[in-house]
Every structure is written in C-alpha cells, then in structure tokens.
Amino acid sequence: MTTRPDAPASAAWTGQTGAPTRLLLLRHGQTALSVERRYSGHGDPELTPLGREQARAAAARLAGVPGVAAVLTSPLRRARQTAEAVAAATGAPLAVRDGLIETDFGAWEGLTFAEARERDPGLHAAWLGAEDVAPPGGESFADVGRRVAVERAAVVREHPGATVVLVSHVTPIKMLLREALQGGPGILYRLHLDLAALSIVDFYPDGGASVRLVNDTGHHPVSAR
C-alpha cells in the first residue's frame, strides 16, 4: 500500500507522540537571477512569467491539501508573489515571517559563482568549506540556520497539530530539512531543490520529526519540465 505524502501522519509508523505540525515547504518560482544562476539573497527581483506560472501550478497542487491553516512567507517579493497565489487557492490567511528570508549574500549579491570567486578567491573558498564564514557584508550559513530554527519553533508553537505552508528560499528550506534529518553541514551542498519545488516535514511536540517528501516538482507546468 502506498501512502500519499500529504496524508495524515501515523504515530505507529514514526514512533513519535502527539499530533505533528505539518510544514509544506515551497520554494518560490523563477526570477531573472535564478535563470542566470546568480546569488540571489536579500535583493528583491520579481517572478518571471514562467515563475508566475510555476506559482499558480504549485497553488493548484496545494489547494488539494485539506485543512491548510496558514500560508507564511519570506518578506521578499519573489516569495510573496508565490505565496499570494497559494493563499488565494487554499483560502488560508497569509502572513509575512522575516525569519524565512534568504541568506544575505552581501557583496556577492547578483554575482555568479565564478564572479564571486574571482572577486574574493580566498574568502569564497573558505565560505564553501565552513558554515561560520560569511560573504563580505553578508550572513553565514550558521547564522541562517539559527534564525530558521527559531522561526520553525515559533511556527510549531503557534500552529500545534496544524498544516502550514511556508514559502521560502533554497537555503532556509535546506536548513529545515537538515534540522528534521539531524544532518550535518554537507546536506547544504548535496541536496538539490528546484524552483517551486515542494517538500513536506512533520514536526512533533516531543521534538521528533518525519520528512515525508523532498523536492517534488510533479505539479510544474509542462513548459518548465
């Protein structure tokens, strides 16, 4: 028998106690910077036409999930535009959560990988190898992990036993998956998350977690596949 990833959790399978808070983790749709594979942190590009199509497709998918209690989004425009489509489709209230914002890439904002490496070769190499190293004027992955963990705990506390959509960015979503899996820093570099991809994690009141889905893109429009 196959269980749908968005079906209610069973404690008999997880061994956890209490009703979990289910987080539906949705990455925002395409932007011009993502097309060009540029560092896109606190800059505020809007969705491309394809990005809007991806947002609508994800929203249609999530409209079929029963009982969505809230849609929480990063304050950045690309996430808010994606979240607005989801809120409209699900009828759930929409709220901005600053803790879901993407990494601040500082002086590397808008640069490609090669451009950032050429600008700051030593620092860039160190940044790739250590979570506590930050881009010039930016934020380390360790800092991102701490604020995302605080935000996750607040969401679970405020929505016990509920299903909540979190619309965010690649790094915060990876941090949430890493926390649930109790994984090391390597997961940040070895886990791929597509634009407008859906992941699902149950967080239990006893501190346990169950990852039910990672990087699902089955709802993507045909033009994006």
What are these regions (language model features)?
Residues 64-67, 155-162:
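Glycine-rich phosphate-binding loop signature in dinucleotide/nucleotide-binding domains
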Residues 89-150, 210-215, 223-225:
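Phosphate-handling substructures
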Residues 1-22, 58, 103-115, 157, ...:
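Acidic, low-complexity terminal tails and accessory targeting/binding regions
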Residues 73-74, 146, 167-168:
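Short beta-strand scaffold positions
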